[in-house]
Amino acid sequence: MTTTRFAPSPTGYIHVGNLRTALMNYLIARKAGGTFILRIDDTDPERSKEEYVDAIKQDLEWLGITWDKVERQSERLDRYAEAADKLREIGRFYEAFETPTELDLKRKKQLNMGKPPVYDRAALALSDAEKESLRAERGNGVWRFKLDQERIEWTDGILGDISIDAASVSDPVLIRGDGQVLYTIASVVDDTDMGVTHVVRGSDHVTNTATQIQIMAALGHGHPEFAHHSLLTGPQGEALSKRLGTLALRDLREAGVKPMALLSLMARLGSSDPVELRTDMAELVDGFDINRFGSAPTKFDAEDLYPLTARYLQTLPVATVKSELDAIGVPADTQEAFWAVAKENITTLKDLEGWWILCRDGAEPLIADEDKEFIAEAMTLLPEGPYDSESWGKWTAAVKEKTGRKGKGLFMPLRKAVTGMERGPDMSALLALMQTVRARG
């Protein structure tokens, strides 16, 4: 059975970059009729917060991304300890004691000599007595996995054939000196224990994947299929990493972005398929194909979400926005007509209130100097109301007959006087909703 996972760290709110990873894994699982696991990477007790666990779940639920089970790494520490013991037994795990300053100095020396900055495995030469002395002086060391210095190869679902020389990679630290288990080994143990068959993540994890493949092999396991998607950039190709804090899903939700607009964009971004609005998740699942994604950096512009949101709102029946209409005071018997007019002229639901204020209170007239006499005369022909769908046609016909104006010279000044805008909804429908026309006096 196809099994995928999304493994966020509860150290902050998830953003569009996280969503891209979550969505790809979710769509693969759902298309195959498989299992999607939400795995909380909470092995860092200082930075992990329960409020962020709740927030992650809320954001995924808002989007309609459902999971089949939840796993928490903090509840699996015994399994990671077992894996570490096995690596020690087979001679693939060793303790190292260098300080960050010492490691940095080594890296600088290697770079100055034109060599790759790879850990030199000096700790392997330490005697037991030297290790005891260092522990007494510095405390417990970190535990590194000893890589076999050979090429690590796999066929990536997006990047194609990958080959990495392990000799160019430092032996990864899997356990810190304070005993904290790091992502690299926790993820390996979880993926094998949980039967994960496909792992989709960012291309910044490629080297990590290479080391994890060796760790899995050392523990006696094969590895899942890997696919590494491109990283997001800003609209001008600039690094997006520094802006991701402003692109949290809850911020987009607060700004009025609708889930299907966001999902429609993220499901196609970086693929050879055009971005098209989809109105339900089943359509996204059916149309998803990991093979259509490329390796080039992918531009993301949050502004693209608003036209998609506007188009999505146009598909909604009035019943789905009743609570929003109630909140701004639209009478129940007016809601259907108001929504029919407003939905074609809003970007987000936040825009509804402005249109209702216009209908309820009227608009500040926009009248050019050369049209003042014309508008004054036209307003004498506009009855008090209430208005209906025929009022605009009858009024403009009367104004045309009285003034001789026609076409744009007739309709545009009247629209601007009534609505304060040069463009907007069909005036027959809008005037029927208006309770006040300020230009009438």
Curated annotation (Swiss-Prot):
Catalytic reactions on record: tRNA(Glu) + L-glutamate + ATP = L-glutamyl-tRNA(Glu) + AMP + diphosphate
Matches recorded under InterPro entries: aa-tRNA-synth_I_cd-bd, aa-tRNA-synth_I_codon-bd_sub2, aa-tRNA-synth_I_CS, aa_tRNA-synth_I_cd-bd_sf, Glu-tRNA-ligase_bac/mito, Glu/Gln-tRNA-synth, Glu/Gln-tRNA-synth_Ib_cat-dom, GluQ/Sye
Annotated GO biological process: glutamyl-tRNA aminoacylation
Keyword annotations of the record: Aminoacyl-tRNA synthetase, ATP-binding, Cytoplasm, Ligase, Nucleotide-binding, Protein biosynthesis
Protein EC: 6.1.1.17
Subcellular localization: Cytoplasm
Protein origin, superkingdom: Bacteria
Binding site for ATP: 242
Motif 'KMSKS' region location, chain numbering: 239-243
Principal location class: cytoplasm
GO molecular function, one term: glutamate-tRNA ligase activity
GO cellular component: cytosol
Motif 'HIGH' region, chain ranges: 8-18
EC class of the enzyme, as a word: ligase
Subunit: Monomer.
Family in the record: Belongs to the class-I aminoacyl-tRNA synthetase family. Glutamate--tRNA ligase type 1 subfamily.
NCBIfam families hit by this protein: gltX_bact (TIGR00464)
Role according to the record: Catalyzes the attachment of glutamate to tRNA(Glu) in a two-step reaction: glutamate is first activated by ATP to form Glu-AMP and then transferred to the acceptor end of tRNA(Glu).
Stated name of the protein: Glutamate--tRNA ligase 2
Organism classification: Bacteria, Pseudomonadati, Pseudomonadota, Alphaproteobacteria, Rhodobacterales
